[in-house]
Amino acid sequence: MTKTYLPPQDALEREWYIVDATDQRLGRLASEIAMVLRGKKKAEYTPHLDTGDFVIVINAEKIAVTGKKRTQKLYRRHSGRPGGMKTETFAKLQQRIPERIVEHAVKGMLPKNSLGKQLFTKLKVYAGPTHPHAAQKPKELKVNTIPGAES
C-alpha cells in the first residue's frame, strides 16, 4: 500500500519570491503564483499540508488583461443587506484598489477550505514598486505570461 509522504513541518524551508506584475497577464500570473503558494513544484509536496512558499507581488496597478476585459469584466461584492450587491468593472477597481484584482484571481485558484485560507496568508500584494519585506531577501520569480515573448 502506497502512503502519502509526510514531510516534517519544522524541516520545511520556505522561500520568499518577488514578482513584478507590470504588463503581465492576470490569469496566467495568478496560476503561477498559486502553484508556488501550494508548493506544487517542490519534491516534498503533500496535498493536505502547507508546503508552499511566500510570494510578494509588486506593481499590481500595472497588471494587464486582454480583449475587452478592462471594461467588461465585473467584480461583485455583497454587503449582506437586502439589495446590497455592488458591481464594479476591472478598470474602476484597478483605480480604486489594484491589489484586490490579483488577490481575487489567486484566491480563486486555491483550495476552498481552511488550507486555502492558510495558503492565501502567504500572498503579499502591493500596488506600487515598494514593499516592506526586504529583510526576507526575496528571490525574483521569473514568470512569462505574454505568449510568444522571450523570458
Swiss-Prot record:
Keyword Ribosomal protein carried by entry: yes
GO biological process: negative regulation of translation; translation
Keyword Nuclease: no
Listed SUPFAM superfamilies: Ribosomal protein L13 (SSF52161)
Gene Ontology MF, one: structural constituent of ribosome
Keywords per UniProt: Ribonucleoprotein, Ribosomal protein
GO CC field: cytosolic large ribosomal subunit
NCBIfam families for this protein: rplM_bact
Function: This protein is one of the early assembly proteins of the 50S ribosomal subunit, although it is not seen to bind rRNA by itself. It is important during the early stages of 50S assembly.
Assembly notes: Part of the 50S ribosomal subunit.
Family, similarity comment: Belongs to the universal ribosomal protein uL13 family.
Designated name of the protein: Large ribosomal subunit protein uL13
Provenance organism: Microchaete diplosiphon
Gene: rplM
